[in-house]
Every structure is written in C-alpha cells, then in structure tokens.
C-alpha cells in the first residue's frame, strides 16, 4: 500500500520478504501435510548470514589456507585440491553447459557478497559441528552430482569429515497420461504442483507409486494407473492382499484358533514347496527393513511387499 511508496529499495525488499516468506512457508507446510510429511525443523539460509555463521566459516578457511584472497578482492576456495579425495573429475560444467578445467571457486565475490557455496558450507558446519549431528543426509537433484565431491571436500577443509555427509541424488519425475508425457514448463507457468496431483490421485496411490523406484531411477508416474481400483494399480493390489490377510486372522480369532509359537508348529504339514518359500521370504522382511534404512532406499519395502 501507500506505506511502501516512499521506501528505498532495501527497505522495500525487507518488507516484502517479511510479509511473503511466512506465507510461502505456511503454504509449503500445508501442502506437505496433505502428503503426510512433517519436517521438525525449518532452517532459514538468512539465519546463517545474519548470525555471522557464513563469515565465520570463510574466516576459518582463510586461516587454514583452504581459501585465499584474489587480486580483485574475491575470496577463493581451493576446491579441486580438497575434492580430489572424493573422485571429482578435472572438468566441470559452466552455466552455458560447456566444460572447463576445474579450478578454485569463489566463496565471497569481489563486491563482498557470499556465494551459495559459502552458505552451503556454513549450513553443514552448523549441522555437524554446532548442532552436533553425527551424519548429514542431503537430497539433491541428480543434475548436481558434480557438486558432491566439492561439498565433501569442503567438509574436510573446514575441519569436519567429508564421510559424514551422504548425498542422495534424485532423478526427475515424468507425469504420464494416456501413455504420453504431460508437458510442463516453469517459464510459461504450466506446472502441476503436489497439491494439484493430490486433487486427482488418492494419497495412498501417490505415496506408494512415488516410492516404487529407488532415488537413482527416473519415475514415469502414470496418472491413469494411479486412479485405478484393480490389480493394475500396485497399491490397490497390496491393500487388497492386506485386507484378505486381516480377514483370515479375524476369522481365526472368532473361531478360537490360537496362534502357536514357532516351536509348536508341526512343519511336517508343509508339503508344498511354495509354502516354505513364502516362510523364508517373510523371515527376510526384518533384514529388508534394515537394508532400506542403511541404503536410504525405502522403495525396497514397496518392492518386497509386491513380491
């Protein structure tokens, strides 16, 4: 309104951010809540700057020699030197998609403004050193794969252990309808949000189908399949099997059939090889849960249940 007319640019920017940021975050939390996801902590990058955490990290890197001041006043980080331990290649992609020799990277520009990389380092230092987490698990888009070694190397440079940072690289999701990709473009505003998707697809179907593939595999999300209520839809297939099992257990209970312990079971009654195969497979389920956790791959659970 009129209150903003005579403000200078910096004041106007602060006022807009102060008004818009809480609303945007509330919207994200609302949408994620519909998908049954709750984040315990929402961390603001701006806090790293306002608290002096970014400057402290850069100063520390200067003290150790991992950074130096260039002739134009920019602060450069010896990225290739520290990333080499983690197998970084000697080339990197530029903004236009071409490749160039890997070289030292800017942490603070000549005009004094820190880069995103400086804030990234400060965040991980905050998590692992200041807040004392034993492990940091990042989820990035697969197009950032070239940054993994650089980030791990930066952890070493700052006095932490790069091995304490695990990065899960996620591939893209393609929405399909009638066997064809649904065309989307951020530039034209033609995009489908998670909220849009959940207005069309049941939440159980969305969660199950998204979790059918490991992070490294691209996902073709079939919108037609997701709304089916037959065995073509894996989530319906699994829910039907679960309902049948519950029905059998309920019938046993109503008829007074006791659940015997393993030592009381007469295994000689199991004459069909498929019965033993099923028992062996069920016995492997606890270990499958452990593997899913250790490998950051919950899709193993979905695939196990379908099998």
Q: Where are the predicted features?
A:
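Non-catalytic interaction-recognition regions
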Residues: 1-307
């Amino acid at each position: 309104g009129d209150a903003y007319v005579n403000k200078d640019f910096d004041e106007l920017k602060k006022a807009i951010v102060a008004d818009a940021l809480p609303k945007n975050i509330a919207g994200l939390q609302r949408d994620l809540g519909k998908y049954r996801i709750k984040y315990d902590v929402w961390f603001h990058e701006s806090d790293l700057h306002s608290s002096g955490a970014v400057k402290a990290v850069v100063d520390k890197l200067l003290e150790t020699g991992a950074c130096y001041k260039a002739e134009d006043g920019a602060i450069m980080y010896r990225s290739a030197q520290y990333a080499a331990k983690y197998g970084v290649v000697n080339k990197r992609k530029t903004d236009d998609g071409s490749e160039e020799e890997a070289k030292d990277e800017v942490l603070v520009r000549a005009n004094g403004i820190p880069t995103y990389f400086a804030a990234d380092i400060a965040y991980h230092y905050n998590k692992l050193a200041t807040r004392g987490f034993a492990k940091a698990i990042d989820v990035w888009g697969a197009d950032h794969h070239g940054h993994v070694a650089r980030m791990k190397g930066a952890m070493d440079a700052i006095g932490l252990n790069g091995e304490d940072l695990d990065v899960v690289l996620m591939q893209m999701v393609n929405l399909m309808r009638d066997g064809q990709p649904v065309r989307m473009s951020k530039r034209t505003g033609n995009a489908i949000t998670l909220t849009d998707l959940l207005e069309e697809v049941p939440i159980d179907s969305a969660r199950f189908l998204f979790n059918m593939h490991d992070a490294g595999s691209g996902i073709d999300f079939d919108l037609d399949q997701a709304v089916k209520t037959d065995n073509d839809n894996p989530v319906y297939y699994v829910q039907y099997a679960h309902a049948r099992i519950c029905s059998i257990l309920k019938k046993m209970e109503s008829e007074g059939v006791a659940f015997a312990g393993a030592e009381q079971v007469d295994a000689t009654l199991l004459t069909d090889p498929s019965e033993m195969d099923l028992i062996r497979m069920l016995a492997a389920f606890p270990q499958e849960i452990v593997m899913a956790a250790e490998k950051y791959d919950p899709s193993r659970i979905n695939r196990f249940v379908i099998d």
